[in-house]
Amino acid sequence: MENNHHLAKDSLDELNPKRGKGEHETQVSQYTVVEEATIPQSLVKTSRSADHKVMEASKVADTRTAWSTKIPAVLLPVFVINIALFKYLVFANFSTKDRVLFGLGNGGINIFSMWLLLATYETWFRSIKEVIVACGAGIRSFPQKRGVNMLYAILKLTFVNAFAIPLLMFFRSHFEQWRLGCPLVERVIGVMLNVAYFIIEIENPGLFTRVFNKYCDCLFAIRDILNRN
């Protein structure tokens, strides 16, 4: 029996000269180990995470569809307010300091008016205090609860444009020789700032959100002051 076993091993080695003697035994043991291996836990966790993301995406899609009928009615008055204030800011005879303050106020008015309209449109609050409380609480939880990320992006873009307005006014105030070409320069700067905003959001998504939340804290402060009164 032993002679037959050695002859079988020698015949295998002769069929494949590159294989060292006895190497087939090692490969057989390796295959045995592979068969006994279990699925890595990391793959299981990844699969569960993917399933969870699919479920969340479907919920967001359903919510976005439900809100699609409300978006035009809510945004139209906000854009009208924005255009009116912007035109007044451009053509009014303000100093640079006044323009900066008014520009920041313009962004604040847009943010607050959007939330005022959203809150009033949805639940018809009975008092201004309740509207401010709802707006302040909703700003931080809006993307998670509503799922309408487009509105949240527009909200933050309004905040970015509030800083863009004073910069545009700087060109109109200090470069009189550019007055004829100033509208084009203003549009280019506005587009560049909005593109820069999206780049920042992609590269460092938490940076602008932290700044935006600081701005939202002002609304919470207003809410607290009104609640004391």
Swiss-Prot record:
Residue spans crossing the bilayer: 71-91, 100-120, 151-171, 188-208
Residue ranges, compositional bias (Basic and acidic residues): 1-26
Which keywords does the record carry? Endoplasmic reticulum, Membrane, Transmembrane, Transmembrane helix
Location in the cell reads: Endoplasmic reticulum membrane
Residue ranges of the region described as Disordered: 1-27
Which GO cellular component term is one of those annotated?
Answer: perinuclear endoplasmic reticulum membrane
Membrane topology classification: Multi-pass membrane protein
Out of the domains of life, which is the source?
Eukaryota
**Family the UniProt entry places it in:** Belongs to the WTF family.
Question: In UniProt terms, what function does this protein have?
Answer: May act in meiotic drive.
Protein name in UniProt: Wtf element wtf14
